[in-house]
Amino acid sequence: MFFRVRFLLFFLLFRNLCCLLTSGCLLRVYGVGFSLGFFICMQIICGVCLAWLFFSCFICTNWYFVLFLWDFDLGFVIRSTHICFTSLLFFLLYVHIFKCIVLIILFDTHILVWAVGFIIYIFIVVIGFIGYVLPCTMMSYWGLTVFSNILATVPVIGTWLCYWIWGSEYINDFTLLKLHVLHVLLPFVLILVIFMHLFCLHYFMSSDGFCDRFAFYCERLCFCMWFYLRDMFLAFLILFYVVYFIFINWYFVFHEESWVIVDTLKTSDKILPEWFFLFLFGFLKAVPDKFTGLLLMVILLFSLFLFILNCILWFVYCRSSLLWFTYSLILFYSIFMSGFLALYVILAYPIWMELQFWVLLLFMLVVCRLD
């Protein structure tokens, strides 16, 4: 039985990684997904190296960690790489999502592929937030305090969930230890979900390019050599640019309050998370009530998910009128993406609360109308 299971796993890996036949006219933007997987693997390797040096001390975690890294060979380089790769991963992730939204205009994507990709996005957001909290600086401490207090507003289980995360009646060393364990374990679960995403993508052939969608013939190529070389070239080209931020301008991704020692008796002058959390943080800031902000954030995430599913199903049943469908969908996507970017910028900056609320309400109505 063990040999059969091992043979089956080896066959699936060999079929999906080496012997996959795909269209020869795949666009170069498909390499963004390969770059995402490449940098996620490098991020996990750097994280495992840093996990050995983590010191679970609520007050002095950041400074002890920095001192350990200075004594450790290439320790600070590994930490700078880990931090810079976080911003890079979220940038590539948003580019990948935008690419998928645009290409759905031309190609139908299987529902299961998009559903697993949505789960990957939720995993990356959770892992990124836990990693943001672990250094326990002034900004991360109050970010964890605000978010855990928001979870406490969930009916019935909110208070129990908040105390379970804290491990006490307040944030302490045990809280950091719990979050550290989750931050180490969740990336390996993420790898399994990514393999599931790849398997569904290759099984349903959702990204087959122009070959099966239009009338002309296109030769199929083996994915093993040509596309791997092309995707690796793109990944190393991105890595070449990131090296500048790792070795020269590594403080570019840091806030100034990322070096402030935590003080539980003094709140931060401003609570401004990393740029990839600004969109989600805007919902919590735009609504005065904590539970309403959390509810709106969850509703919007699932509204975006249902919006794409609606477009996929619409494509399946409207293939006969492809030209009319393409024009109308381009119009919808232009309205949607412009509203998304405007909401991202407006909610990120400290402007009037009333303006943030009305912009949020308008965007929610647009998304619900498109659904």
Swiss-Prot record:
Pfam families: Cytochrom_B_C, Cytochrome_B. Heme b b566 binds at residues 96, 197. The main subunits of complex b-c1 are: cytochrome b, cytochrome c1 and the Rieske protein. It is a multi-pass membrane protein. Component of the ubiquinol-cytochrome c reductase complex (complex III or cytochrome b-c1 complex) that is part of the mitochondrial respiratory chain. The b-c1 complex mediates electron transfer from ubiquinol to cytochrome c. Contributes to the generation of a proton gradient across the mitochondrial membrane that is then used for ATP synthesis. Coiled coil: none annotated. It comes from Leishmania tarentolae (Sauroleishmania tarentolae). Gene3D superfamilies: Cytochrome Bc1 Complex, Chain C (1.20.810.10). Its cofactor is heme b. Binds 2 heme b groups non-covalently. Heme b b562 binds at residues 82, 183. Heme 1 (or BL or b562) is low-potential and absorbs at about 562 nm, and heme 2 (or BH or b566) is high-potential and absorbs at about 566 nm. InterPro entries: Cyt_b/b6_C (IPR005798), Cyt_b/b6_C_sf (IPR036150), Cyt_b/b6_N (IPR005797), Cytb/b6-like_sf (IPR027387), Cytochrome_b_N_euk/bac (IPR048259), Di-haem_cyt_TM (IPR016174). It is found in: Mitochondrion inner membrane. A ubiquinone binds at residue 202. The chain crosses the membrane at residues 32-52, 76-98, 113-133, 179-199, 227-247, 296-316, 329-349, 350-370. One of its GO terms (cellular component) is mitochondrial inner membrane. Belongs to the cytochrome b family. GO terms for biological process: mitochondrial electron transport, ubiquinol to cytochrome c. This is Cytochrome b. GO terms for molecular function: metal ion binding; ubiquinol-cytochrome-c reductase activity. The keyword Cell inner membrane does not apply. Its main location: mitochondrion.
